[in-house]
Amino acid sequence: MHSVDPTTEQMIRAVLAYAENRLRVLRRMPHPGRGFTQGLTVAEGTVWESTGGYGESALQRYELGAAQPGPRAALPPELFGEGICRIRAHLWQLTWRERVALRWDARSLDLLSTIPFNREGWGICAADGCVLTSDGTSELVRRDPATLEPLEVIRVRLDGERVTDLNDLEWAAGRVWANLFGQRYLVGIDPDSGEVTDLVDAKAVMERHWGDPEAVLNGVAALPGDGEFLLTGKNWRSMYHVQLVDDRPRKQPARLLAG
């Protein structure tokens, strides 16, 4: 069982006390199927969702705001589905510990190929000319979008300290956005330096799901609009169209962490 890195949590709590992006909930929607969400991506009003669990993992597609799930493709029972991203007409789906990635037709949900993958699979997103992946550590890997071959390792830091538990990923406004496993925080990351540039406390949506230890935030996808995202979590009843609101003056993390 993966545990949350307490150092990362304490560090982010300290910084969030002074510099925070607030979430404004614009719309609450049903979460079709209430799956064990591991990955999420949206394009032109269509949502693709990866759900996990051995013998329960699947890839499904539905329209944004739909109450009922749409087409669904089950994974083999020995695979645990993780993050997904869309590259033109295809989808990449990672698996947790099985060291393979799946390539799907985005429209038909036909499985096209299975390839070796060199790490645990957590999150994946399409970026400028590449894809980026996470494995629950403080590292992101830049990869070839056609083959997933690794090109570069990016070490994520906040004021020189490692930020671990990087989970589902999304690309928006020149930043990599990640939710942190088991926590209520999102971080925005500079893809060139690996430095955390944005911190978001998602308590506005988390507080509606407290009480279930497995119902953690997991699933972030960019939506049209400035700073707008779709958020959900494992077994959540709802999905949330949110907007980031930067309503506090920024200070340097170094000064904050030094007290």
Question: Which stretches of residues belong to each language-model region?
Answer:
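Conserved beta-strand positions in repeat-built beta-propeller and related beta-rich domains
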Residues: 48-55, 91-98, 131-137, 178-182, ...
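Hydrophobic, well-structured mid-protein blocks that either form specific transmembrane helices
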Residues: 101-159
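Blade-loop segments of beta-propeller domains
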Residues: 67-103, 109-123
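Beta-rich, blade/repeat-based domains predominating
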Residues: 33-44, 77-87, 117-131, 160-174, ...
